[in-house]
């Protein structure tokens, strides 16, 4: 129905557009006609003026006639325009009504198709379904009747409008055929036309109100006419139905005046039909009677007549019984067929109901799956968007890190260049300082030699003044170098040590070596760089770096120890695991051997044969347990002990060992199950944490999107 409405709307719009185009064309044609008429009138006026002047010698009469002619022309033009506008309106209304008729016909066809489809769909339905179908059919028939009535009224209105159009066209033709000037016979009509023209020219609110009322009354009249036409059509239909029911040439007033009976016309028709059948049967029986019955005796004529009446009654009764029997048989067969059809329909209905249930359940499951898939797709889309955002962020971070790495590399290259330049400078400075130190040491040696010489001279001069002996003078002369030699040697050693410290620790300690006094001279050198703030700052930084380095070394040692301890623990646990696996294998092999031995002990008939077999037996287990020599030795010893024991004790021992092995196996299974359960719990917790993290992540993303929006 939505498609029909949309198509109807499009058709209406197209129809409106066509009407507008036609209206514009008509306006253009009317304007052209007006221009032509005005030009023709102007020419005719000029000719009449030229022609009237010589006939009528008075100019006033000619002017009055011209004015009257002009006024009449104007009135006629107004009437023509009014008639043309009415004609145009009626044409437009006629087109609209034709369009509405087409739409109604289309709706009627659509409804008929729908009714047929409903009939085909609900054929064979019984019970409530049949009632629903009947009610629906009744409603549709009512709607169809209403639409048919509307279509009939529209057709009647179209006929009226076509008649009106024809009348208006006729009036228009008559008005155009009228002469422009009239004689003295139309002298009485001229004042009326002038009055109508004056009224038309005057546009007052009262006139407008009256025109509106006139239009409303015209609309009401058209509606009433349509209703009257529809009522007339219904009356005609009713009369046709009565004529078909009662018969033609029957006075309805007499039927209304005559008292009615309880029997209707249909019942009377049935009674008459039954009487006709009876009469036909009687006629057939009379024709089939033998000719000998006519030659019967006269005295028995009354009895034969009586018998014929009885026979007639009997025949009639028998025929009625036959008819009843046939009708009963027909009804029974119809009932059977209807019952079979009803059973089939019930089966079909049950099948369809079960099918509908199955399909509804499938539809529900599919809808739930669709909803879950839609939710999953939405979550996946959100996750993909989040991952894409994260990927973009990581790409941005990677690009920034690459830029930082490039900048760090460039800065590292600059630092390396600076360090190399500083190292070259420091090496050149160290070489210069070494040269200076060597020069100063040479100067110091020269000064020491000069001081020694001066001291010797001083001692000589002092000895000469006091009158000392040359031996005494020699003694101190010899003594002074001896006494001074250790000092000079010590000073030399100190200088060597200072030079070594300079060479080993760089130019920072050269200054301290230079400021340190090399010998006990009377004028000592003052320290210049021993207490400088720069040196103190470098020393403090060096101490801090040293402390940090020591702490890092201690931490590294601790971590190494921790790693070694962990490695030891891992190795111990792995060794324990291997040992446990080896023991488990040994115990399994031992249990297998014990079971085999027990079976053989049960099968052996005597103790001697058992001992012989056990003596010959130890070969295969040793071959089976080649990888574990200790296990094979234990098994051999246990087997020899079992061989020495009696049968009952051997069986008890084997049962005890088997029970122990079963307990150990159960314990190992329990341990394995607990380990598996622990792993499963860990895996479950891992999945739960992942789900929680995913949920939190999605919630945060949704909040972020909501905040952005």
UniProtKB/Swiss-Prot annotation:
Any GO BP: cytoplasmic microtubule organization
An annotated GO cellular component: centriolar satellite
Top-level division of the source organism's lineage: Eukaryota
Coiled coil location: 70-97, 139-178, 206-288, 323-457, 539-604
Low complexity bias (residue ranges): 293-302
Location of Phosphoserine modifications: 258, 469, 532
InterPro entries noted in UniProt: CCDC13
Keyword entries, A-Z: Cell projection, Cilium biogenesis/degradation, Coiled coil, Cytoplasm, Cytoskeleton, Phosphoprotein
Positions of the UniProt region annotated as Disordered: 281-312, 462-499, 512-542, 600-641
Keyword Aminoacyl-tRNA synthetase among UniProt keywords: no
Subunit structure: Interacts with PCM1, CEP290 and PCNT.
Role: Required for primary cilia formation and promotes the localization of the ciliopathy protein BBS4 to both centriolar satellites and cilia.
Name of the featured protein: Coiled-coil domain-containing protein 13
Upper lineage: Eukaryota, Metazoa, Chordata, Craniata, Vertebrata
């Amino acid at each position: 129905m939505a498609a029909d409405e949309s198509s109807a709307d499009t058709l209406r719009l197209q129809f409106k557009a066509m009407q507008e185009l036609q209206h514009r064309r008509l306006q253009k044609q009317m304007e052209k006609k007006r221009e032509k008429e005005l030009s023709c009138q102007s020419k005719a006026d000029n000719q009449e003026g030229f022609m009237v002047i010589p006939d009528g010698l008075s100019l006033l009469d000619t002017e009055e006639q011209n004015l009257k002619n002009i006024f009449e022309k104007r009135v006629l033009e107004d009437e023509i325009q009014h008639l043309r506008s009415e004609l145009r309106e009626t044409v437009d209304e006629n087109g609209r009504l034709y369009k509405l008729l087409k739409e109604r016909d289309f709706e009627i066809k659509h409804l008929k198709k729908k009714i047929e489809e409903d009939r085909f769909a609900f054929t064979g339905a019984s019970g409530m379904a049949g009632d629903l179908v009947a009610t629906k059919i009744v409603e549709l028939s009512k709607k169809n009747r209403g639409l048919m009535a509307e279509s009939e009224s529209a057709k009647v209105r179209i006929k009226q409008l076509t008649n009106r159009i024809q009348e208006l066209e006729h009036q228009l033709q008559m008005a155009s055929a009228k002469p422009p000037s009239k004689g003295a016979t139309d002298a009485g009509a001229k004042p009326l036309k002038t009055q109508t023209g004056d009224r038309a020219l005057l546009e007052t609110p009262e006139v407008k109100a009256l025109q509106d009322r006139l239009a409303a009354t015209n609309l009401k009249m058209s509606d009433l006419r349509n209703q009257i036409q529809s009522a007339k059509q219904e009356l005609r239909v009713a009369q046709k139905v009565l004529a078909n029911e009662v018969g033609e040439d029957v006075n309805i007033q007499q039927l209304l005046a005559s008292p009615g009976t309880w029997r209707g016309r249909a019942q009377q028709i049935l009674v008459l039909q039954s009487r006709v059948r009876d009469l036909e049967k009687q006629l057939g029986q009379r024709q089939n009677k033998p000719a000998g019955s006519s030659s019967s005796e006269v005295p028995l004529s009354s009895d034969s007549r009586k018998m014929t009446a009885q026979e007639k009654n009997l025949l009639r009764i028998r025929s009625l019984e036959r008819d009843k029997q046939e009708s009963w048989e027909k009804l029974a067969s119809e009932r059977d067929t209807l019952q079979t059809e009803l059973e089939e329909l019930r089966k079909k209905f049950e099948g369809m109901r079960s099918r509908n249930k199955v399909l509804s359940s499938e539809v529900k499951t599919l809808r739930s799956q669709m909803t879950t898939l839609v939710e999953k797709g939405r979550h996946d889309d959100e996750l993909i968007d989040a991952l894409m955002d994260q990927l973009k962020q990581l790409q941005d971070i990677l690009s920034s890190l690459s830029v930082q790495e490039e900048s760090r590399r460039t800065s590292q290259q600059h630092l390396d260049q600076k360090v190399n330049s500083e190292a070259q400078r420091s090496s050149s400075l160290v070489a210069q300082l070494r040269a200076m130190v060597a020069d100063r040491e040479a100067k110091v040696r020269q000064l020491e030699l000069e001081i020694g010489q001066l001291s010797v001279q001083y001692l000589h001069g002092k000895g000469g003044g006091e009158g000392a002996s040359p031996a005494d003078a020699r003694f101190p002369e010899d003594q002074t170098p001896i006494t001074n030699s250790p000092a000079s040697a010590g000073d030399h050693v100190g200088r060597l040590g200072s030079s070594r410290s300079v060479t080993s620790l760089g130019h920072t300690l050269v200054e301290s070596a230079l400021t340190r006094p090399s010998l006990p001279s009377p004028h000592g050198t003052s320290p210049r760089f021993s207490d400088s703030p720069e040196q103190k700052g470098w020393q403090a930084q060096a101490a801090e770096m040293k402390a940090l380095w020591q702490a890092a070394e201690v931490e590294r040692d601790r971590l190494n120890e921790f790693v070694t301890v962990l490695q030891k623990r891992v190795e111990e646990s792995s060794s324990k695991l291997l040992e446990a696996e080896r023991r488990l294998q040994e115990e399994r092999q031992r249990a297998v051997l014990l079971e085999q031995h027990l079976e053989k002990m049960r099968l052996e008939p005597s103790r001697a044969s058992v001992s012989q077999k056990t003596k010959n037996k130890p070969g295969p287990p040793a071959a089976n347990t080649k990888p574990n020599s200790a296990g094979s030795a234990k098994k051999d010893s246990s087997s020899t002990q079992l061989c020495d024991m009696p049968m009952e004790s051997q069986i008890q021992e084997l049962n005890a060992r088997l029970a122990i092995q079963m307990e150990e196996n159960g314990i190992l299974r329990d341990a394995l199950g607990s380990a598996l359960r622990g792993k499963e719990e860990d895996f479950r917790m891992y999945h739960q944490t992942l789900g929680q993290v995913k949920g939190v992540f999605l919630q945060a993303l949704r909040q972020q999107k909501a905040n952005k929006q």
